[in-house]
Amino acid sequence: LNQYKKLIPNGNNLGIKISYIEQDKPRGLPDAFVLGEKFIGKDNVAMILGDNFFYGQNLTAKLLDCVKIRDGAKVLLHSVQTPELFGVAKVDKNNKIIQLKEKPKKFISNNAITGLYFFDNKVVQYSKKLKPSKRGEVEIIDLLLRYKKNNKLSADFIGRGGAWLDTGSIEDYYKTIAFVQAIENRQGFKIACIEEIALNNKWIGKKEINKSIKFYGNCNYSKYLKNLI
């Protein structure tokens, strides 16, 4: 955690605010909403898993639409060839989720639930009431089922041309590196350069970019930042 704080402290260099809360032991994903109750306040909230990689030309527009949710929850789905390895969802014609299953033995759908979730403010109270599973943690699938029970769970899709990669294993981590490297080398642009994103959104200016260049030192990333200004 200290390494993350050193790399991205409070977000001032990006024109945003960043806070850190540490989960002292594994208690499951929904526990994050309990720990972050004061931080969340009366707002709605999104959760993204740190080992998930998302890429797509239309992804930004989808995310901006997802954060507008005011009542209920929404998940991002992606079609996979091995649904038995993932939590999957079956949806109706209106993208309402009608069935959820974690690593189903029988085919339900090939729509895997990715590690990107959007919730209304009820998520904090719902998370507090979850009971741990056999492995001793509260489960994200149980939280989603709570919303589904109330008919408040919908979905959107990454869609064709988009990518979702899980970097939870060494093999998948290197596959993701190769994917990013291939696209960046071909296009000449960085994927998810946070300083570039902040600059394009006018959250920061040349002053902050120059500070980042000094922080990173003499490297290719600094050279890329120099070309932005």
Predicted regions, residues:
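Conserved N-terminal catalytic core of the sugar/cofactor nucleotidyltransferase
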Residues: L1-L49, F53-A61, S169, I209-F215, ...
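Short coil/turn connectors at secondary-structure junctions
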Residues: L14-K17, G41-V45, G50, I69-A73, ...
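Catalytic-core segments of class I nucleotidyltransferases/pyrophosphorylases
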Residues: A46, L64-V67, K96-E196, W203, ...
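Short beta-strand segments
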Residues: M47-G50, L76-S79, G159
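Generic C-terminus detector
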Residues: L199-I229
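Conserved beta-strand termini and adjacent loop/short-helix elements that scaffold enzyme active sites
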Residues: I21-Q23, L76, D156-I158
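Conserved donor-nucleotide/metal-binding helix-loop-beta segment in metal-dependent transferases, i.e.
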Residues: G56-E84
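A structural signal for short hydrophobic beta-strand segments in well-ordered beta-sheet cores
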Residues: A89-V91
